[in-house]
Amino acid sequence: MPGPDRRTLLRRALRGTGGLLAAGLLPGAGGILPAAAQTRFSPEANILFFTIATGPPGGTNFPIGVALATAVSSPPGTPPCDEGGACGVPNLVATAMTTAGSVVNVKGVVSGIFNSGMAQADVIFRAYHGAGFDFEGAPLTDLRVVANLFPQFVHVVVRADSNLKTIADLRDRRIAVEALGSGTRRDAELILAAYGVRPSPDRILALDQGDLGSLLAEQRVDALILIAGIPVPTVMNLAERQTIRFLAIDGPEARGLATQHRFFATDTIPGGTYPGQNPVRTLSVGAQWVVSARAPEEQIFLLTQALWNPANRNLLTSGHASGQFVRLRTALRGIAIPLHPGAERYYREAGLLPS
């Protein structure tokens, strides 16, 4: 009879901690704690509690963050990795925290509210350099990257019955993007400008992602631009209700954007991601794991080592479809600010950086 899997062993070990933070470790659970309730270290139990700020419960980052928290945790009482137990950092218990998203996460990491966070590479870049959003003139220079995790694909969606064939065709059209502060609007403006499209402010609608699909379905806008891990629920719902098409981001314009802005990468939305959809050439922005420069080097080295332990692969791929993209070979892709020294040490030892 097969023994319990790693997730079951972690659940049992957490009972010995009074269940504290267990919700953040188990997929599908809430993982929500007020900042004041976060415990960094429990001397009595010899446990280090470690928070990972993710995103809204219905998004991609939260389930990936829960899987990440499970992978790097190894509570007291858990069997060692080579005996089928936890392959995380000894005596560390990580929890995934639901948040509003990237901007909140990078601010929270630098201010010490969170031990770490997940954020889009473009938001990380702008935060570090103090350019755009709430970061203008106030750079978060203490921000450091641990790893690039998975791509968040740029989706440009139109109705199948429209006459829009290329990004350049969006000139003078009504376009809906995610709300201001998400990073999507600024990226959308960069992409549109590369194709000679500079819409006036009244032609771009910024709304919560959940509201975007109805605008296109009701023909109140001509196109949607979203950046997210795949599949995107809003796009999936649209594709199941009506026929849609995707506009490619390709050619010299796409290559120029990826060259000029290090957080962009040329990419492809795989065929079959959405009903009846062929492969789509596009750009992607990495979802990356960040910490403060003040985090101890040895701790971040061990966290990076646990993240890329081959024994944790199934944990990372089971939480969400985007988990399939969390791979060591793309760990340094699209990183545009300094690595944390602990992470840098790991990648040098792993041969991904020159020694």
Mark where each language-model region is.
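N-terminal secretory signal peptides and thylakoid transit peptides that target proteins
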Residues: M1-G24
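N-terminal segment of the mature folded domain
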Residues: A96, G101-V146
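Bilobed "Venus flytrap"/periplasmic-binding protein-like clamshell domains
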Residues: F49-G84, N148-E218, R313, S318, ...
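N-terminal (or domain-start) structured segment
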Residues: R40-M118
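Pocket-lining segment of extracytoplasmic ligand-binding domains
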Residues: A121-V123, A131-G132, S162, R198-V290, ...
